[in-house]
Amino acid sequence: LTAFLGYLMAVAAIFLDIGNTLRILLKEEPYRTEARQKIVSLIGTSESPEVFCTELERRYKEYRKWAFEHLSEAPEEELWTRGLAPEFPAQRITPLAHELTYQFRQSMGRRVMADGCKEVIHGLHARGYTLGIISNVITTSEIPNWLAEEDLTRYFKSVLLSSSFGRRKPDPSIYLEAARRAEVAPEKCAYVGDNFSRDVTGTRAAGFGMVIILPDTAEKDEAVAPQQQPDLQDQIQQEILKR
C-alpha cells in the first residue's frame, strides 16, 4: 500500500464502490439456475424459470434505462410491484420484495470478494482513514448483510446505497450525503470506483478531492472524455484491490 498511500496524504476519508471494486461477479450457471428457480417459487408462477426470468431481465433493462435517465432508484417494493412483476397481487409481492431482489441479483451470478480486498480495508483503517461505501444497487439488505458476514461493518462509518437513498451516481447528492454522514468535508474525500462516466463525473461535481479508477476490463479500451479523467488509475491497481 506504500505507493497508493503516498497519493492520499491530503485525504481523510476514502469511499469505495462495490461492483468490480470490492466484489467481482462470477457467472456460474448452476448458481444462477438455482436462483431462477427460487424466484419462480417465490412469485408463484407456473412458467419455467428460464422463460419467466428472461422476461424479468427484459423488464429490468427497461427499469435501468429509466434509472439512468433520472438518476433515481426505486424502493424494492415499488421495483417489483410496478416494474418487474406488476401482474401479480401487490399484497403478496410486497413482503417478498427484498428476498426477490436478492435472488434476482444471484440469478446474474455469484459475487465474491476481490483478491486482497480485506487486507486493503484493514490497512487503510489502521492508518486512520475514515472509510465509506457509495454504490448503485437495487438491494437495501444484501450489502449490509455481506459486510456483517465478512466482519467488515465496523470499518465503514458511512455506507450509502442508491436503493436506500433514492438517488444514483453520478448525482452529486449521493456523494455529498455520504461525506456528511462520515463527517468529513468533500474536498478531503477520495473515491475509488471502476466507471469513468459515473464515478468521475459525480465525484467532481460533489467537490471530492480525489477520484481513483480501477477500470473494469470492458471499459479499458473505451475513449474517455477529458472531464472524465480520474486523478489516478492503473498505476495504483497493485497497491489497492488486486483483482
Q: Whereabouts are the PLM-identified features?
A:
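N-terminal helical cap/lid subdomain that shapes the substrate entry/recognition surface
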Residues: A10-E119, A126-R127, T140
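Asp-based, Mg2+/Mn2+-dependent phosphohydrolase catalytic module
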Residues: L1-L16, I24-L26, E47-E50, K118, ...
